[in-house]
A protein has these predicted regions:
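Glycine-rich phosphate/adenosyl-contacting loop at the front of the ribokinase-like
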Residues: 1-70, 75-79
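Ribokinase/PfkB-type carbohydrate-kinase core domain
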Residues: 2-21, 82-96, 108-229
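Short acidic/glycine-enriched loop/turn segments that link adjacent beta-strands
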Residues: 99-102
Length: 229
């Protein structure tokens, strides 16, 4: 793998994502076929998914944005890199030369729930040293998404959390966790290290309830207030 290093000579506070980025391929079908069936999809539309949306939103607000996750080498990775370039997002993470980035096929039939088929790629195949070279600078915001907490790359996130320590006042950057709906699948060890890091938790109501249940915290629904969710 190759690493890209951050220049810190004249640093401007940035949003840094440790999350995974992949390509979503949206397929609209009349009905999701049963096993052995057949369906015709209208207007297939590839787009960038995962933590890309957070980076894109921050960039549109005029904030420098950096992706510290892994990108691969191939068709999908090229699509991601081009989207980064078009949206002012800098990739500072590892480059995996022997594997493409992954993709998700998303089947939508008009039903409330979509059907997902995932092909994991370079983004999911990190290890304990994936984020070793990342050194957040003063006033940076480091964003960790739930999609990075369940596969090989999670060991790298865990290493970063241990380096971040347990006292937010001792850090000169802000650590934000967006657990997504995968929080119920995160293993106990990882959840413990997330909690001990004392980050800012960015949750909707369902995610906040799941977190409370995982931690064994009492829930009084009448007193639960979730801003924006």
């Amino acid at each position: 793998m190759l690493n890209l290093k951050r220049g810190i000579g004249t640093h401007e506070p940035s949003v840094i994502s440790l999350g995974q980025v992949w390509v979503d391929i949206m397929l609209n079908v009349d009905k999701v076929p049963a096993q052995g069936g057949f369906a015709v999809a209208d207007h297939p539309k590839p787009s960038i998914g995962g933590s890309y949306r957070v980076l894109q939103a921050a960039s549109r607000m005029g904030v420098p944005t950096e992706h510290a996750g892994i990108l691969g080498n191939g068709l999908w990775a090229h699509f991601i890199r081009q989207s980064f370039q078009d949206n002012g997002i800098t990739h500072i993470g590892q480059d995996r030369l022997d594997e493409d980035s992954g993709f998700r096929v998303v089947l939508s039939s008009g039903a409330p729930q979509k059907t997902f088929i995932a092909s994991y790629g370079a983004e999911a195949h990190g290890d304990s040293d994936t984020f070793d070279t990342l050194e957040p600078q003063p006033k940076d915001v480091v964003h960790i998404s739930g999609n990075t907490l369940m596969d090989h790359t999670a060991t790298g996130v865990d290493g970063f959390l241990l380096k971040a320590g347990t006292d937010p006042a001792a850090r000169d950057y802000t650590l934000v966790i967006n657990p997504t709906n995968t929080l119920r699948l995160v293993n106990d060890h990882m959840l413990e290290d997330l909690v001990l890091a004392r980050p800012v938790w960015s949750c909707n109501r369902q995610e906040a309830m799941t977190l409370a249940e995982r931690l064994g915290a009492p829930i009084d629904d009448s007193k639960v207030t979730i801003g924006g969710g």
